[in-house]
Amino acid sequence: MQSAPLLMMLLLRASRALVKPAARSSRCSARYASAQPLGKRGVTDGSEGITLFGSEAIQNGAAPAVTVFWLHGLGDTADGWAGAFVPGGGVTLPTPDYKVVLPTAETLPVTLNMGMQMPAWFDIFGLDAGAQVDEAGILKASKRLEALVAMEDPSTKIVLGGFSQGGAVALTAGLRCKAKNVAAVVGTSTWLPLGDSYPSKLADGALKRPVSLHHGDADEVVRTSWGVASKERLEELGFKVSFATYPGMAHSACPEEFDAISSFLKSSL
């Protein structure tokens, strides 16, 4: 087992190395002027009492047919993934009319990192199978994502996705969200938390949502076996799951993964 500081360095290094901000800016403003960054927004859903914090959005077309919510990993922000979703950035949406919403997690003390404050969707106590799980934090983050979904037009198809810790929240919301327009779920380098709480906590109609999981076979942070176990649990529950591994990829992303996600979205939406 690696030391906590080393594991946190791997987490932070992996999440921040995914997309270079400079490349993101040039693609969005120069080559693809039609994809407009909507900027940061901070709102509070009074009905739920949930502060949604800041988020960034990229929109192409006046009336999105598809909205993707993508959650970053531990220690990162929305900026770390924005470049993957501008046209030509990596992930291709199956419609010219879309919106991508990238929330940023609130800053929390992370037990695994000796209480250091960083953007986190929930606390992490350890990275082994027997570690304590922050159930309350996971469910709070899932509710935040569900509140964002509720703000979208009911006719818009919704995709929930994320990387690492963000993927764990996306999977949780994908199984629990009651919104009928949630159409697909994507998780990269991630795992399904609270697996024993299902099927009792599944939302009506959740089993209709296809799930696409992706993992590097050299991941030293979230083990590939966690991804495999998540796939198997989802299949036990009755979900249609696709699972892809990428040779030599650590806790990161790669062009082949983006291509696979693009193909999944094209076939699922």
Annotate the PLM regions.
Residues 1-23:
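N-terminal chloroplast transit peptides
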Residues 27-35, 41-43:
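N-terminal mitochondrial targeting presequences
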Residues 38-156:
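Serine-hydrolase catalytic machinery in alpha/beta-hydrolase-like enzymes
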Residues 66, 209-210:
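Alpha/beta-hydrolase fold active-site loops
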Residues 81-85, 199, 223-233:
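Short alpha-helix in the alpha/beta-hydrolase fold that links the catalytic acid
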Residues 154-204:
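Primarily recognizes the serine-hydrolase "nucleophile elbow" in alpha/beta-hydrolase
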Residues 212-215, 219:
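Short beta-strand/loop motif that positions the catalytic acidic residue
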Residues 225-269:
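C-terminal catalytic histidine-bearing segment of alpha/beta-hydrolase fold enzymes
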